[in-house]
């Protein structure tokens, strides 16, 4: 019995403990769980409501999208139809424009091709003509015949004489021309009483005075003042040069400054001219005039074909002594013996270039040498050497044309093909076959 009571008390204690300490937490836990389940049920109900709402909204959006897409498609179809019509209209206009422009381009291209074809045919015709001419004149007899035909044409020009003035005169105005004539007459009177040595000394002193006047511009300007009384000019030249040059030179200088000169440089030109005349007088007395003329023209042609040498001789950055030294080296290396008078004339020319190109100054010197004998210089270029008869006929015809004896200076240029090229002073007569071919080519259309 006591055991039962003990068990009952133990059971009661256990029940008390369970009710006291276990049941409250379990109740709270169950209540919390129930609350959580209830909240979940509420959330599920809300989610179901939202799902229903979203489904409804989705359906509405789908319907609206279908309606909008149908509207956009309808508008796009309308726009596409309108654009298609516009493009079709523009394409028609563009096609007409392209067709018109293409037609113009075709016409322009046809014109250009026609012009180019004509030009090519023209050049080919000229080239073929040139070949025919070259083959024709390859025969020396036929080439000589071209010269004879040109001389026939030139002979027909003989009645029409041309007025050709001598060198230096063409550069001066009337007052200086008169002064040069008077001074030359005075020089001739003085020179006839001098021997060759005195003439050479006179030439050298005149060149020295000309160089001095070229440097002293103020003195030259005073000596050429166009005053009626020449006394002051004569006294000045005497004070400057008395005792420094010979009496003959001083006499010539007195005569020079007594004249009226149109330009300051004309006095220097006149002194240079007289210095050349003195040396040419020596050549004439020694019967060396032809040799002097030939060598001067030969040196002139050398400068024409060797422009580098002409540039060096006229390089004013180099002292005159250096340029004269170069000239002497060239003359010493010549294949022929250079006449001393030619060397002196060329040296004086280099010393008194005064801004002129060397090749022009030497050519002018050669013309002065020929003009001393009253001859006119004719520079003649031919494709081959002339026969004696042709040279004589050419000289005779040119002498009749210009009314003066003519000195023919011949130069060979095979590029001329045939005929002759004649230059007298500033007048040029071109009767070469090469010039005719060039003229034919120049007349071709561009």
Swiss-Prot record:
Gene3D superfamilies, per the entry: N-terminal domain of the delta subunit of the F1F0-ATP synthase
- InterPro entries named among the record's database cross-references: ATP_synth_B-like_membr_sf (IPR028987), ATP_synth_b/b'su_bac/chlpt (IPR002146), ATP_synth_F0_bsu_bac (IPR005864), ATP_synth_OSCP/delta_N_sf (IPR026015), ATPase_OSCP/dsu (IPR000711)
Q: Where in the cell is it found?
A: Cell membrane
Q: Which residue ranges does UniProt annotate as crossing the membrane?
A: 4-24
User: SUPFAM superfamilies, from UniProt?
Assistant: F1F0 ATP synthase subunit B, membrane domain
User: Per its UniProt record, what CDD domains does this chain match?
Assistant: ATP-synt_Fo_b (cd06503)
Q: Which UniProt keywords apply?
A: ATP synthesis, Cell membrane, CF(0), Hydrogen ion transport, Ion transport, Membrane, Multifunctional enzyme, Transmembrane, Transmembrane helix, Transport
- Name a single GO cellular component: proton-transporting ATP synthase complex
Q: Provide a Gene Ontology MF annotation, just one.
A: proton-transporting ATP synthase activity, rotational mechanism
UniProt-listed Pfam families:
ATP-synt_B (PF00430), OSCP (PF00213)
Q: Which family does it belong to?
A: In the N-terminal section; belongs to the ATPase B chain family.
Subunit: F-type ATPases have 2 components, F(1) - the catalytic core - and F(0) - the membrane proton channel. F(1) has five subunits: alpha(3), beta(3), gamma(1), delta(1), epsilon(1). F(0) has three main subunits: a(1), b(2) and c(10-14). The alpha and beta chains form an alternating ring which encloses part of the gamma chain. F(1) is attached to F(0) by a central stalk formed by the gamma and epsilon chains, while a peripheral stalk is formed by the delta and b chains.
Its recorded name reads ATP synthase subunit b-delta
